[in-house]
């Protein structure tokens, strides 16, 4: 109630003045009358702050009842009472106000009563804090003062009080009845919880914080949110038969309670046929401090019993301060809830105001609950209203309308029923936002679906300058809608309590324009040069004023605005404008137009538009225009028609039969195999001519297009192409389209491509106009893995104790697909397990193991794990188990245990290092042990290794190394071998390589001990495994392995001496010479046949004639 605490700084006023108005509807944009707080009256106490004149309003036919809850009294009997509050009756004709006195008594010190507190204190009682009544002078008027209190020797009892009169026909109240049922002493404070808790029952009731008069004038519903420790309740005050009057049955209290309802001014008027019912909130489990009864109303909510009046009241602090509202009926001392509405924001004060009205014309009452402290994002106190549309059987459809302004306007502080202000069959409402600058009121129209989403009109405070009391709070007081000027349309008033003013807004009649434009035919023949256009128009309105029923219209007709193929004969342009007087009767005008035919535009219709509006506008002034009318801004303001060209088809619109099919589309695509994916489509028309045939295509992945043909365009990942170079596609014609998608970034499991063809006409068989291709996407990558030892081969004759082996590996992707995550694992054997023992034989000095990997010029992180899958080194760029200076490093496992790996002696499988004496003992005992036993132990290793030799070596080495003399040391038998695993993860792209450098030291003493006769070669085999994420079976890639193992030989591999080669060559030459000589001696080279032929020729010389003949032939 403290307005000062809610005022905004004046700095916002200049900004608010710049806010553009929503297009005005039928209320005047400025008030027709301003009614100010009366200054001519004599007040006994000076007014030091705003009287809040206009806080509550009840409009009647010729006057308006105005509440000013902080006004000083003009009565002599109340001359010493501060801010009694006042009710004024103000003339709607001249704006003159006079006090409307409901209670002329001052403060009362009543004699002691056994039953009730009868003394009265009216200081700051807020008379007019709530007020309600119908819009006729014959309707009842209910006025309340919620801060009225009764003093006692110990407390002040904030009971509240209300007054009502049967009508306001007379200029002064007649037969005022007071309602004050909370004065019984026995009901002030009650014990609860078996006497362990005291409850403020009636003592702080605040009767009259809200008040409502039912439309039939037979019932009052009054809120008392302070009852029962602010659980709150309502007082239903209604007509009852005398025998049903509960006050008549109360022993010894009937006279005291009857004073509750008696006429203030006369003891002769006792309406005993009215009685209050006060439900006890504890009986239905109302929460403490929930303020039930803060706002009240009534309506016909039950679709199964549409004549039963039910009630609605709010509890803004219920539901953990999110607020609730209930539809209920009063049943004795309790209520029966039919439905519960709830707010959605903590502290939004859901239920500050409530309104019950049928908004969609279905005969069922709907509910609006305001939440003026609803917060928009990054703000507060913006406000909202919750609209609950009654769908029947207490099912409600919720709609939330948030403040149209972003300031802290407290939109929804006041709600009012305006009735059907535009006569469209639906009731409308006003919503106050009194703290939007100086205040704003929004008008919302009802519709078939409830309230429209946007306000039809916004009424700002007439003055943007603050009053002497601050911002005006324009819109905190709203009257109902009432036709005060007799034009058939409801007017209403708005109160601005902090400006101490009431503003009257009259409503203009609403008219509807019915206008059409059409051509004499829907088709234009190619040879046709002229077309006749007809424009028709008329008005309709519910107004009975003859001056309103006829309005001047401004009409503008435009044709073919884009191509301008048509022009009016009269203007020689494609537009014509004129004015006409329209009324209830339809009138028409004809216009002749000239048409220019164009073959290429035959498929483009000629658009025909007629724009119309009232010429006489509502003036932006305080003067009401008696002959003006207004059109609903949501009504159409243009009439349209299209005219087509004749196409030679059987009907006005051609029926084509387009067929679409894709050609040679592969069902699968290997990701990365190409940057573009091409699809070919063929389109055939087997129906009538297809005008403006078009083809569009898109993909579910919204792929970009690699190429856009000249006859195509791309809009939002959809390519649209004009077929047949933009010309019509005749029957039997075929066209084709090639589409190229950019698939360089494509991923996923499948690609779905949708294609469609269409034309401007009808389609005989739409099912074959669409083509959907589902292409399965697969990944495949070919990987080359190669590598081996880069330093010289080790033999035990030239190396002793230990030797370092350096390996380089390269893993390269040959594509085509990218592997999103490839895990590369190297398995490196480091020690043998001794059968039947817990000891192990270390082969590779794990502390010397160093690895460095790079990919695409970037170092890769390497994770190192032991045989128990315990991570030893986490994400280093270089794996090493030695520190600078050659010191041994303690390896920390994930379970925070630590151990050192030593290069000499035997280490237990538990990775616990033996102490020095144990290592020495083990070394000495090994030298003294039985050779037979030692051989047997090595034979056991050799036998296991020999079994796997052929399987574990590559094909190149299977032929080079003797099977029966080679031992293979690898990680494929976890029962015999201890290994470590180096793991890397990489986003593997084609033509990119992983390069790994690995080096470690080998304990040659152990190797030498193992290589007993007949074993000659010790092979260290490092395994490589690749794992692709999402492919546990590794079907989407292949590996070409060329990885060479590390070979340690027992003896040096010697080459063939050069002198042996020279001797062999000489010996070969001598042997060849000897063989050739022997063959010559034995006549192998003699040619006997040739010698015989030569001898025969000599014995038979050629005849001369033949010789001469031969010579003559040559001449």
Swiss-Prot record:
Positions on the Cytoplasmic side per record topology: 1076-1115
Reported tissue expression: Expressed in embryonic and larval hemocytes (at protein level). Expressed in tissues undergoing invagination, tissue movement and morphogenesis such as salivary gland, trachea, midgut endoderm, dorsal vessel, midline of the ventral nerve cord, amnioserosa and the amnioproctodeal invagination. Expressed in the mushroom body neuropil, brain areas that contain mushroom body processes in synaptic contact with other neurons. In egg chambers, expressed in border cells, in stretch cells and in dorsal appendage primordia.
High-level lineage: Eukaryota, Metazoa, Ecdysozoa, Arthropoda, Hexapoda
Example of a GO MF term: integrin binding
Signal peptide annotation: 1-24
Cellular location(s): Apical cell membrane; Lateral cell membrane; Cytoplasm
Primary site of residence: membrane
Name of the protein: Integrin alpha-PS3
Residues spanning the membrane: 1055-1075
GO terms under biological process: apoptotic cell clearance; axon guidance; behavioral response to ethanol; cell adhesion mediated by integrin; cell migration; cell-cell adhesion; cell-matrix adhesion; dorsal closure
Ranges of the FG-GAP repeats in the UniProt entry: 39-99, 113-174, 193-246, 278-335, 336-397, 398-453, 460-522
InterPro entries: FG-GAP, Int_alpha_beta-p, Integrin_alpha, Integrin_alpha_C_CS, Integrin_alpha_Ig-like_1, Integrin_alpha_Ig-like_2, Integrin_alpha_N, Integrin_dom_sf
Residues with glycosylation annotation: 46, 82, 166, 438, 696, 845, 868, 964
Protein function: Integrin alpha-PS3/beta-PS is a receptor for laminin. Also binds to wb. Important during embryogenesis for the development of the trachea, dorsal vessel and salivary gland, as well as for dorsal closure. Required for short-term memory processes. Minor involvement in the establishment of the oocyte anterior-posterior length. Plays a role in timely border cell migration during oogenesis, probably mediated by JNK signaling.
Keywords: Behavior, Cell adhesion, Cell membrane, Cleavage on pair of basic residues, Cytoplasm, Differentiation, Disulfide bond, Glycoprotein, Integrin, Membrane, Oogenesis, Phagocytosis, Receptor, Repeat, Signal, Transmembrane, Transmembrane helix
Subunit organization: Heterodimer of an alpha and a beta subunit. The alpha subunit is composed of a heavy and a light chain linked by a disulfide bond. Interacts with mys/beta-PS and Itgbn.
Family annotation (PANTHER family): INTEGRIN ALPHA, INTEGRIN ALPHA-PS3-RELATED
SUPFAM superfamilies for the chain: Integrin alpha N-terminal domain (SSF69318), Integrin domains (SSF69179)
Family assignment from sequence similarity: Belongs to the integrin alpha chain family.
Membrane association type: Single-pass type I membrane protein
Example of a GO cellular component annotation carried by this entry: focal adhesion
UniProt note: phenotype after gene disruption: Flies display impaired olfactory memories within 3 minutes of training. Mutant embryos show reduced level of phagocytosis.
């Amino acid at each position: 109630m403290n307005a000062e605490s809610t005022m905004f700084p004046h700095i916002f006023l200049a900004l608010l003045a710049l806010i553009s108005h929503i297009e005005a509807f039928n209320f005047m944009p400025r008030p027709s009358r301003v009614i100010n707080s009366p200054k001519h009256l004599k007040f006994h106490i000076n007014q030091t702050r705003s009287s809040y004149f206009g806080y509550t309003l009840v409009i009647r036919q010729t006057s308006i009842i105005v509440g000013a809850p902080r006004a000083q009294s003009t009565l002599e009997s109340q001359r010493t009472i501060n801010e009694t509050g006042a009710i004024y009756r103000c003339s709607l004709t001249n704006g003159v106000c006079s006090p409307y006195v409901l209670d002329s008594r001052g403060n009362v010190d009543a004699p002691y009563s056994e039953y009730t507190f009868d003394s009265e204190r009216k200081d700051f009682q807020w008379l007019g804090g709530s007020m309600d009544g119908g819009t006729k002078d014959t309707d009842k008027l209910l006025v309340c003062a919620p801060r009225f209190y009764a003093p006692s020797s110990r407390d002040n009892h904030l009971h509240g009080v209300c007054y009502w009169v049967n009508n306001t026909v007379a200029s002064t109240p007649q037969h005022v009845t007071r309602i004050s049922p909370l004065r019984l002493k026995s009901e002030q404070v009650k014990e609860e919880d078996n006497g362990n808790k005291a409850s403020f029952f009636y003592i702080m009731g605040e009767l009259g914080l809200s008040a409502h008069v039912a439309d039939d004038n037979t019932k009052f519903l009054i809120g008392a949110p302070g009852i029962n420790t602010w659980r709150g309740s309502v007082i239903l005050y209604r007509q009852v038969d005398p025998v049903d009057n509960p006050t008549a049955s109360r022993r010894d209290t009937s006279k005291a309670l009857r004073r509750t309802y008696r006429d203030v001014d006369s003891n002769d008027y006792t309406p005993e046929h009215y009685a209050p019912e006060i439900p006890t909130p504890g009986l239905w489990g109302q929460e403490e401090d929930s303020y039930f009864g803060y706002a009240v109303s009534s309506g016909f909510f039950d679709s199964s019993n549409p004549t039963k009046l039910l009630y609605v009241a709010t509890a803004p602090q219920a539901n953990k301060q999110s607020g609730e509202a209930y539809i209920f009926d009063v049943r004795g001392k309790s209520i029966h809830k039919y439905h519960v509405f709830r707010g959605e924001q903590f502290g939004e004060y859901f239920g500050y105001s409530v309104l019950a009205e049928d908004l969609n014309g279905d005969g069922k009452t709907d509910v609006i609950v305001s939440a003026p402290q609803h917060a928009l994002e990054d703000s507060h106190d913006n406000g909202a209203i919750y609209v609950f549309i009654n769908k029947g059987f207490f099912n409600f459809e919720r709609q939330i309308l948030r403040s149209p302004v972003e300031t802290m306007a407290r939109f929804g502080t006041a709600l009012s029923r305006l009735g059907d202000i535009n006569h469209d069959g639906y009731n409308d409402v006003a919503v106050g936002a009194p703290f939007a600058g100086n205040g704003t009121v929004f008008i919302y129209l009802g519709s078939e679906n409830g309230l429209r989403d946007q306000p039809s009109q916004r009424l700002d405070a007439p003055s943007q300058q603050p009053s002497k009391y601050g911002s005006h709070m324009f819109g905190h007081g709203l009257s109902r809608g009432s036709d005060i000027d007799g034009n058939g349309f409801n007017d209403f008033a708005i109160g601005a309590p902090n400006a101490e003013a009431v503003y009257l807004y009259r409503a203009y009649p609403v008219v509807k324009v019915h206008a059409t434009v059409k051509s004499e035919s829907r088709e234009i023949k190619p040879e046709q040069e002229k077309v006749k256009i007809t424009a028709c128009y008329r008005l309709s309105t519910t107004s009975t004023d003859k001056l309103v029923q006829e309005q001047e219209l401004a009409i503008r007709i435009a044709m073919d605005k884009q191509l301008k193929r048509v022009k009016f004969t009269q203007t020689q342009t494609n537009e014509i404008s004129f004015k006409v007087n329209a009324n209830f009767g339809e009138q028409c005008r004809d216009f002749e137009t000239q048409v220019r035919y164009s073959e290429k535009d035959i498929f483009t219709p000629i658009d025909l538009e007629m724009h119309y509006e009232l010429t006489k506008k509502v003036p932006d002034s305080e003067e009401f225009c008696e002959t003006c009318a207004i059109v609903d801004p949501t009504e159409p303001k243009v009439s349209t028609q299209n005219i087509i060209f004749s196409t030679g088809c059987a009907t006005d619109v051609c029926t084509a039969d387009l067929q679409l099919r894709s050609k040679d589309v592969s069902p699968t695509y290997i990701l990365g195999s190409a940057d573009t994916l091409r699809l070919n489509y063929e389109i055939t028309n087997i129906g009538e001519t297809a005008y403006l045939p078009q083809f569009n295509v898109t993909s579910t992945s919204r792929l970009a297009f690699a190429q856009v043909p000249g006859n195509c365009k791309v809009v939002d990942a959809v390519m649209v192409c004009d077929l047949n170079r933009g010309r019509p596609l005749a029957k039997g014609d075929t066209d084709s389209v090639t589409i190229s998608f950019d698939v360089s970034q494509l991923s996923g499991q499948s690609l779905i491509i949708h294609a469609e063809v269409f034309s401007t006409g009808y389609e005989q068989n739409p099912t074959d106009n669409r083509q959907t291709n589902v292409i399965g996407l697969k990944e495949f990558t070919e990987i080359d893995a190669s590598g081996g030892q880069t330093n010289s081969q080790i033999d035990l004759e030239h190396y002793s104790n230990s030797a370092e082996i350096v390996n380089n590996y390269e893993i390269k992707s040959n594509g085509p697909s990218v592997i999103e995550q490839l895990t590369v694992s190297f398995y490196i054997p480091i020690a043998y397990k001794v059968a039947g023992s817990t000891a192990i034989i270390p082969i590779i000095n794990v502390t010397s193991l160093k690895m460095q990997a790079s990919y695409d010029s970037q170092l890769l992180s390497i994770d190192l794990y032991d045989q128990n899958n315990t991570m030893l080194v986490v994400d280093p760029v270089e794996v090493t188990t030695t520190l600078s200076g050659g010191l041994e490093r303690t390896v920390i496992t994930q379970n925070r245990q630590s151990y050192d790996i030593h290069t000499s002696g035997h280490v237990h499988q538990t990775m616990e290092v033996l102490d020095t004496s144990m290592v020495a003992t083990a070394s000495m005992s090994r030298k003294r042990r039985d050779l037979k036993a030692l051989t047997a132990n090595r034979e056991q290793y050799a036998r296991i290794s020999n079994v796997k030799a052929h399987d574990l070596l590559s094909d190149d080495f299977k032929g080079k190394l003797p099977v029966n003399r080679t031992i293979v040391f690898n990680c494929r038998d976890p029962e015999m071998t201890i290994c470590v695993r180096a793991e890397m993860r990489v986003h593997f792209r084609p033509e990119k390589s992983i390069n790994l450098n690995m080096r470690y030291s080998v304990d040659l003493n152990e190797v030498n001990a193992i290589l007993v006769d007949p074993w000659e070669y010790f092979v260290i085999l490092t395994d490589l495994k690749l794992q692709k994420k999402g492919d546990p079976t590794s079907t989407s890639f292949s590996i070409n392995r060329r990885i060479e193992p590390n070979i340690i030989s027992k003896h040096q591999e010697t080459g063939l001496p050069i002198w042996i080669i020279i001797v062999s060559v000489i010996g070969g030459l001598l042997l060849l010479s000897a063989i050739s000589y022997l063959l010559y001696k034995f006549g192998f080279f003699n040619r006997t046949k040739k010698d015989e032929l030569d001898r025969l020729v000599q014995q038979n010389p050629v005849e001369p004639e033949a010789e001469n003949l031969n010579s003559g032939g040559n001449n």
